[in-house]
UniProtKB/Swiss-Prot annotation:
PANTHER family: MULTIFUNCTIONAL PROTEIN ADE2, SI:DKEY-6E2.2
Pathway(s) of this molecule: Purine metabolism; IMP biosynthesis via de novo pathway; 5-amino-1-(5-phospho-D-ribosyl)imidazole-4-carboxamide from 5-amino-1-(5-phospho-D-ribosyl)imidazole-4-carboxylate: step 1/2
Protein name: Phosphoribosylaminoimidazole-succinocarboxamide synthase
The keyword Nucleotide-binding is annotated on this UniProt entry: yes
UniProt organism field: Psychrobacter sp. (strain PRwf-1)
Catalytic reaction equation(s): 5-amino-1-(5-phospho-D-ribosyl)imidazole-4-carboxylate + L-aspartate + ATP = (2S)-2-[5-amino-1-(5-phospho-beta-D-ribosyl)imidazole-4-carboxamido]succinate + ADP + phosphate + 2 H(+)
Molecular function in Gene Ontology: ATP binding; phosphoribosylaminoimidazolesuccinocarboxamide synthase activity
Amino acid sequence: MQLQKQDLLYKGKAKSVYETENSDYLILHFRDDTSAFNGERIEQLGRKGQVNNRFNAFIMQKLAEAGIETHFEKQLSDDEVLVKRLEMIPVECVVRNFAAGSLVRRLGLEEGQPLTPPTYELFFKDDALGDPMVNESLSVSLGWATPEQLAKMKELTFKVNDVLKELFDAGGLMLVDFKLEFGVFQDRIVLGDEFSPDGCRIWDKETKKKLDKDRFRQSLGDVIESYEEVAQRIGVPMN
């Protein structure tokens, strides 16, 4: 399928979305922009768009092999990918295998505390509101999703967790937590957006070194080098 990039549909914090001549498909452009704190801090980090695009393509293909439908169609270039056009559900699904980030702040937990079984949370995707936590009841009452869609999203999120925990563990890494976004394509719930170190927490199993966007949030340095290390350790082809 050879589709050409047309009008800019949407520019997010780190990706731009373009129309194609086929209304069922879009082109995502992964930019070098890196943001934190709901877009309050934005910087350019060289190679980031390429690294995240390749990382995401690898993960999406692994998930497809496990029977999880995603919007990924094919990688077009170093920083662009062809995807199905989804009707996005404005709710982020977050799984936590270990305590970190906002959960530590909210409940006073020790960072790195194992969570068994993993926790599952929903957040309304709205930067202006700070992506507040919501629940299934609110999501249904406000018309964001049906109970059946929410149940499928939860099922798929835990399936993703099972697949990726094993993948990262084999690379000597801890998948601490991650967020997913879903949409509807031809009446099916499909995984959308991206999976990269921008949207998850990944630590070295032995040293607990952070290898994700917390390096940017916490000004730890070596952000892209850490992304590339994770990619290398799980087998992402970077050339």
